[in-house]
Amino acid sequence: MPAVLREGDELILHLMIQPKASRDQIVGLHGDELKVAITAPPVDGQANSHLIKYLAKQFKVAKGQVRIVRGELGRHKTVAIESPRQIPAEIHALLETQG
């Protein structure tokens, strides 16, 4: 299963989250997933909220257009982004290699 998929006007991301990182960043491929480092700790949903906010900023969409489809309580998550207005270079490169 690829780390990034296009389904209609949605972008589906299979992510491996690294909480409590020194900075927020899309690290790159990690096996079949895209590794994303975030500064928030994995406590009381803080990491999920922070991840949604970070991805919304990266894809230039409202936070309501980013939803966690699977993996709310774990490090491995599937996230859907509705109608992204911008695609970060790391993810664009992955989409290009998929054809």
From Swiss-Prot:
It comes from Aeromonas salmonicida (strain A449). Signal peptide: none annotated. One of its GO terms (cellular component) is cytoplasm. SUPFAM superfamilies: YggU-like (SSF69786). Belongs to the UPF0235 family. SMART domains: DUF167. This is UPF0235 protein ASA_3628.
